[in-house]
């Protein structure tokens, strides 16, 4: 009986050992589903096991009932997609209003339309980037989407610069500027800015990327550090020019107010209030632009691909807000566009005030 008990204990030990070995083998052969991204997608997008997930990572959950892998969406990507949706909706409305209203086809509104078109493309790019990132994860698609976004945002910033130059010239040469400014000249200016923006967007597609040299990647893959340095430097130059022009605009406004004061022997309260309001508006315009883009531009210069991806998201998301605010600052505050909105949505709104082309400083 002791022999049979010993044999039984020995068989139980062998069975337990066999079960343990099988469990270990199963664990070794089963991938860890808590890691970022499927292996193939991570390798294709450059989002491997490094600490920085760039903007191209998604986590993988266990298989569902149908056997398909469920992709966990990054909340930051959702925020960018939502931002892109709002941007696209706002700017599509502005583009439609300018295109469908003959009175809004003056040179000033052509510049505003260019800004709205660039922001519309940027919003669509954010939406497509989200869709393709989780549906078609590939190097080619990633490269095309990044180039598209670079070109769109570059065109947006360039259009802002063109509007600033137009505002400055309209105030500095108020007597002769409107007679010299033509629609053809504005179109040529915008053609030049869009050509430069398109060139910046094509650079990564034409080979200036870090797909072949991971060590040269920036905080936004597949852009190289030298490429984002060029983009950031270009932004700093544009921001510096805009700052200089807006300071000059404020000087012109205050000089005009001082001349009125000399003529009237005092600065009338309406003129003082209008001057302060104009300067405050310029401060809001420039402050919004700087607060939106400066953090991302600075981080692109000082950041590194080893930094956590959250730093890139946290600075890029506010930059997209600039394209969300632009329609409010440059379009919806304008009386002609407000009237066009009434005509579009109501159809019965009648105004006895005829359309007039306002100066860019009033936009």
Swiss-Prot record:
Q: What is this protein called?
A: G-protein coupled receptor 6
- Gene Ontology terms describing biological process: adenylate cyclase-activating G protein-coupled receptor signaling pathway; G protein-coupled receptor signaling pathway; positive regulation of cytosolic calcium ion concentration; regulation of metabolic process
| Bilayer-crossing regions | 76-95, 108-131, 144-165, 187-206, 232-250, 279-305, 311-332
User: Where located?
Assistant: Cell membrane
Lipidation positions, renumbered (S-palmitoyl cysteine): 346
Organism classification: Eukaryota, Metazoa, Chordata, Craniata, Vertebrata
**Entry GO CC:** cytoplasm; plasma membrane
Q: List the disulfide bonds.
A: none
Q: What job does the chain carry out?
A: Orphan receptor with constitutive G(s) signaling activity that activate cyclic AMP. Promotes neurite outgrowth and blocks myelin inhibition in neurons.
Q: Which organism is it from?
A: Rattus norvegicus (Rat)
Cite the entry's keywords alphabetically: Cell membrane, G-protein coupled receptor, Glycoprotein, Lipoprotein, Membrane, Palmitate, Phosphoprotein, Receptor, Transducer, Transmembrane, Transmembrane helix
Q: How does it sit in the membrane?
A: Multi-pass membrane protein
């Amino acid at each position: 009986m002791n022999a049979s008990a010993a044999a039984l204990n020995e068989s139980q030990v062998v069975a337990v050992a066999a079960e343990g070995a099988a469990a270990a083998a199963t664990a070794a052969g089963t991938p860890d589903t808590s890691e970022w991204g499927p292996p193939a997608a991570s390798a294709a997008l450059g989002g491997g096991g490094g600490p920085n997930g760039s903007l191209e990572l998604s986590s993988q959950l266990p298989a569902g009932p149908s056997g398909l892998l469920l992709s966990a969406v990054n909340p930051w990507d959702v925020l960018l997609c939502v931002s892109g949706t709002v941007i696209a909706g706002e700017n599509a409305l502005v583009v439609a209003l300018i295109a469908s209203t003959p009175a809004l086809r003056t040179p000033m509104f052509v510049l505003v339309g260019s800004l709205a078109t660039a922001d519309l493309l940027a919003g669509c790019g954010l939406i497509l980037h989200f869709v393709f990132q989780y549906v078609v994860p590939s190097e080619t698609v990633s490269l095309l989407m990044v180039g598209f976004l670079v070109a769109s945002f570059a065109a947006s910033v360039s259009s802002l610069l063109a509007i600033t130059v137009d505002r400055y010239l309209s105030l500095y040469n108020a007597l002769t500027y409107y007679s010299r400014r033509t629609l053809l000249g504005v179109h040529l200016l915008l053609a030049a800015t869009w050509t430069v923006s398109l060139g910046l967007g094509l650079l990564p597609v034409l080979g200036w990327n870090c797909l072949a040299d991971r060590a040269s990647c920036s905080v936004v893959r597949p852009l190289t550090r030298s490429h984002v340095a060029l983009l950031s430097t270009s932004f700093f130059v544009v921001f510096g020019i805009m700052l200089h022009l807006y300071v000059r605009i404020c000087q012109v406004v205050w000089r005009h107010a001082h001349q009125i004061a000399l003529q009237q022997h005092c600065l009338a309260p309406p003129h003082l209030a209008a001057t302060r309001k104009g300067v405050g508006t310029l401060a809001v315009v420039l402050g919004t632009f700087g607060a939106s883009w400066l953090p991302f531009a600075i981080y692109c210069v000082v950041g590194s691909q080893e930094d956590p991806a959250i730093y890139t998201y946290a600075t890029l998301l506010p930059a997209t807000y600039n394209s969300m605010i632009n329609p409010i600052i440059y379009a919806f505050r304008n009386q002609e566009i407000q009237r066009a909105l009434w005509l579009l949505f109501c159809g019965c709104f009648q105004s006895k005030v005829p359309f007039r082309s306002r100066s860019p400083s009033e936009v």
